[in-house]
From Swiss-Prot:
Keywords: Cytoplasm, Initiation factor, Protein biosynthesis, RNA-binding, rRNA-binding. It is found in: Cytoplasm. PANTHER family: TRANSLATION INITIATION FACTOR IF-1, CHLOROPLASTIC (PTHR33370:SF1). It comes from the Bacteria. Pfam families: eIF-1a. SUPFAM superfamilies: Nucleic acid-binding proteins. It comes from Sulfurovum sp. (strain NBC37-1). Belongs to the IF-1 family. GO terms for cellular component: cytosol. Residues 1-72 form the S1-like domain. One of the essential components for the initiation of protein synthesis. Stabilizes the binding of IF-2 and IF-3 on the 30S subunit to which N-formylmethionyl-tRNA(fMet) subsequently binds. Helps modulate mRNA selection, yielding the 30S pre-initiation complex (PIC). Upon addition of the 50S ribosomal subunit IF-1, IF-2 and IF-3 are released leaving the mature 70S translation initiation complex. This is Translation initiation factor IF-1.
Length: 72
């Protein structure tokens, strides 16, 4: 996937699900299912419900995404 094809949007983690999957509410009100990006997994960055995160969505599937950053 080319880097310029992704849509980046901020959101808030609503629920933690099994297998490092999270339900995230985006700033526009949509709820998407997200998994953690590989670099975040590699560096053991923990994500809890209530955290503000940056999510990447593809134009092909707007109901699934990848968490790429956790704001402090």
């Amino acid at each position: 996937m080319a880097k310029d094809d992704v849509i980046e949007i901020d959101g808030k983690v609503v629920e933690a699900l099994p297998n490092a999957t999270f339900r995230v509410e985006l700033d526009n009100g949509h709820i998407v299912l997200c998994h953690i990006a590989g670099k975040m997994r590699m560096h053991y960055i923990k994500i809890l419900p209530g955290d503000k995160v940056k999510v990447e969505l593809t134009p092909y599937s707007l109901d699934k995404g990848r968490i790429t950053f956790r704001y402090k």
